[in-house]
Amino acid sequence: MKITYIHHSSFIVELKNHILLFDYFQGNLPQFNKNKKLYVFSSHSHHDHFNKSIFKLNKIHPGVTYILSKDINSPKSENIKLLDANEKLVIDNLEIETLQSSDLGVAFIVKVENKTIYHGGDLNWWHWEGENSPEENAYAEKLFKDSVDKIKGKIIDLAFLPLDSRQGNEYYLGFDYFMRSTNTKIAFPMHFWRTYSLIKIFKASNYALNYKDKIIEINHENEEFQL
């Protein structure tokens, strides 16, 4: 399994017979192996998670399938599947499940080639100290936990989780809760706004003490990882 970090929350997961592209909006995409089926996921319509340019991929990789959150304004096509929160879809050899985001759209759980892959989109514990009221922060916490608790104890082979530097001292909350709530084997931070140093800080912190070896350090865009 090869993982390529594109930019922000965008990753490519290449398996033996399938290629998954998550939340692309900018960055350099490699040439995809045309012998493998390509699936493009977009978790919601925010500008840092979606770009309509993804629909051009169909011209260079025939047979691409799009799995998009329903809030995305997309063309009508048989190869475009729109999903709401808490829905399930089986397409080809993929089993796809969605969770309600605590912001907009969905998080994806994808079962393919005996792997369970999670991409959180903007599902995160969005605690904004000094910006939101205590009541707003409590509500954001509840939204996040209500979704993650639905997969409590689940075995996840590969997870992509927000680690947002803008949250100040609370940057770790969502990542930490997810790791403690699930049986996740490998976790990639995302949504860190090019603050690569935050990953090292988090891995060295007491918060990550019990799972630091499961966290993959990202150092630059288009970095590849063989797992």
Language model feature labels by segment:
Residues 33-34, 52-55, 79, 131-132, ...:
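Short amphipathic alpha-helical segments
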Residues 27-30, 46-50, 72-76, 87-89, ...:
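Active-site environment of divalent metal-dependent phosphoester hydrolases
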Residues 26-72, 149-160:
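Active-site metal-binding motif and surrounding structural segment of the metallo-beta-lactamase
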Residues 4-8, 77-89, 171-227:
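Binuclear metal-ion centers of metallo-dependent hydrolases, dominated by the metallo-beta-lactamase
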Residues 143-149, 168-177:
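A short, acidic, amphipathic alpha-helical segment used as a generic capping/interface helix at domain edges
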Residues 1-35, 79-155, 219-227:
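Core dinuclear metal-dependent hydrolase active-site scaffold
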